[in-house]
Amino acid sequence: MKIADARAVITGGASGLGLAVARHLTTAGGRVTLLDVQEGPGQAAAASLGGNAAFAKCDVTSEEEVNAAMEAARAGMGSINFLVNCAGVIGAGRVLGKNGPMAGDFFTRVVHINLIGTFLCDKAAAAIMQHNTSGPDGERGVIVHTSSVAAYEGQIGQAAYAATKAGVAGMTLPIARELAMFGIRVCSIAPGIFGTPMLSAMPPEIQDSLGKQVPFPARLGRPEEFAAVVQTIFEVAYLNGECIRLDGAIRMQPK
């Protein structure tokens, strides 16, 4: 499939990697529906992208909201053949912190957003994609997960985050194998240190220090580079069931 033919749902589309993907796709002629729990920023993001973008408010931890948002996206775009899961939270916290052990509710919240939210979006999108007219190789749709290098080298304070991102990477292959019968591919991207709004708010010297930890190129990853890999996954039909590290060869230290 070509990116101009994308009818994409992008979770976490109001900012960061999700917005970068949306901008990349619409610039190439694709259509997108942004899903985000932040209504104001989500509507503003969609408006900034022009007529090929729409917004639907959605909490990815709610199965009812996810199903409704997917149906609204299908109705608005005519079909869905691409899902890019970017919604997530960092969820930094120590198991034994200064104020005592981590609250179970904190860990559960991170799991619900990062892992269960991704799964709920996967199954809702796949239920729609399975009815698409098949293209070359019988393809009907593509799903992309956002994992993280923390899935492989989680740092101190990342127990919840690393667990969820490892779960996202871990379910990629079994879901890809299951959905193969419907002509739906599934891949994950595990980004390293990227220049997202959270990092951009840090002092320049901190950003430079983080960038210098990357072997090559010695800088923060650019959201546009993440978006370019998303396009590659969509267009290269033989990419399936894989988790791609996008990290400049960095291997995270314990802290």
Feature roles, as predicted:
Residues 2, 222-246, 251:
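C-terminal substrate-recognition "lid" of short-chain dehydrogenase/reductases
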Residues 2-33:
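Canonical Rossmann dinucleotide-binding motif of NAD(H)/NADP(H)-dependent dehydrogenases/reductases
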Residues 67, 90-108, 131-137, 157-160, ...:
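Conserved mid-core segment of classical short-chain dehydrogenase/reductases
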Residues 89, 100-120, 144, 168:
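Catalytic Tyr-X3-Lys loop
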Residues 122, 164:
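Active-site helix of classical SDR
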Residues 127, 176-178:
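Alpha-helical segment proximal to the catalytic Tyr-Lys
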Residues 148:
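Residue(s) in the substrate-gating loop at a strand-loop-helix junction
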Residues 180, 185, 239-242:
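Short, small/polar-rich loop/turn modules that mediate ligand/substrate recognition or access, typified
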